[in-house]
Amino acid sequence: NLKHPQSSKEYFTRFCEEQGFLCEIQEDIENLTVRKGVVYIAIKQQDVVKVVKQGRLEGLKCGKDFGLLAYNDIPSYEVIDEGITSLSIDWEMMGNEAANFVLNNVPIQKYLPTEVRLRKSL
């Protein structure tokens, strides 16, 4: 079950429309066919692995034949298929904000900056 905010679908679709990008949201990737010239965005870590493996099964190379953008960076994205590009918040900043809340009981509602870590998957 996807724990990612469902409102992201609306914002993603709107962004694509405004930029003139064709987009499709496919929540079930069990039967995904990876296509040449398409960029995939994976929210869950296991979906990153599934897309890369499926691309290989179809004789396609990530970063050359298809693109992949992962949500929330992890260290292994640096080494999977020469690097998976990720979109992520600054986790250290989030940890500091959470610690400040716990230690000082200071409520926060704050947007954290998003970083793109560009690697060879795009």
Spans of model-derived segments:
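Bacterial carbohydrate/catabolite-sensing allosteric modules
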Residues: 1-122
